[in-house]
Amino acid sequence: CRVGNDYYMTASSFGCLPGLPILHSVDLVNWEIIGYAVERLEPAEQFDLASHGNGIWAPAIRYHNGEFYIYWGDPDNGIYMVKTKDPAGRWEKPILVHKSKGIIDTCPFWDEDGRAWIGHGFAGSRAGLKSVLAMIEMTPDGTKTIGEDRIIYDGHEDNVTIEGVKLYKRDGYYYILCPAGGVPTGYQLAMRSKDIYGPYEWKIVMAQGKTD
């Protein structure tokens, strides 16, 4: 995320601790690790043991009302959030925002009216479905979900393995930037709608190249 002339980024850390590395840059080329957002994962009884490939999947960092937020999907436990006013300092303990199984690739979004949302994908290994995107409304402070989890796009016909939601709004349109097609043959999509729940039109904005 961008705050003034500073850029911040984080990444999946799965079960490794400290987790959620915080990277800072002023030019989007040179990056420095300035800290970590998570010292301990919950539930402790699960992560006190080796837990390969579990834990923090595909986090999203955002800045809202003077605070930095990171949300991530733990495919076995649900959606978690940590926040801070100083990204290089100490982050608050993780909050379980939404208890569930199979949710991954979460991204928060705050609208102009103060309402908050969390978009996400699904891990087929846990949820029993994938290739769809969904949206849940949150309380304005982003600490818990309210209402139902609604599928906003089904990619089975045109964009299988769609995942990795990143949410934005510009000129009255809600935008989702996300990958689809799987790792070996994947591509990047831009989707947009006048309604956060859709329907969404989409366009491939970056595709696989060829090496001769």
Locate each region found by the language model.
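Carbohydrate-active catalytic/glycan-binding domains of CAZyme proteins
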Residues: C1-D212
